[in-house]
From Swiss-Prot:
The lineage of its organism: Bacteria, Bacillati, Bacillota, Bacilli, Lactobacillales. InterPro entries: DNA-dir_RNA_pol_omega, Pol_omega/Rpo6/RPB6, RPB6/omega-like_sf. This is DNA-directed RNA polymerase subunit omega. Its EC number is 2.7.7.6. PANTHER family: DNA-DIRECTED RNA POLYMERASE SUBUNIT OMEGA (PTHR34476:SF1). The keyword Transcription applies. Promotes RNA polymerase assembly. Latches the N- and C-terminal regions of the beta' subunit thereby facilitating its interaction with the beta and alpha subunits. Signal peptide: none annotated. One of its GO terms (biological process) is DNA-templated transcription. Disulfide bonds: none annotated. It catalyses: RNA(n) + a ribonucleoside 5'-triphosphate = RNA(n+1) + diphosphate. GO terms for molecular function: DNA binding; DNA-directed RNA polymerase activity.
Amino acid sequence: MILYPSVDDLLEQVDSRYSLIMLAAKRAHDLDAGSPELLSNYESPKNIGHALEEIAAGKVKIKED
């Protein structure tokens, strides 16, 4: 269970829980592959936590087609 960032904070950045999970998984995969981190400080030690923190900060968005 995640404590930070809260699901409510995350859902302010995306339309649905499904979109949130897909965006977080994609960003975590990108971080695993060596993409640069977008924040200077992270509370979580894992890439999925980094992805969620970046989403909450508004640094990662879903690309609209």
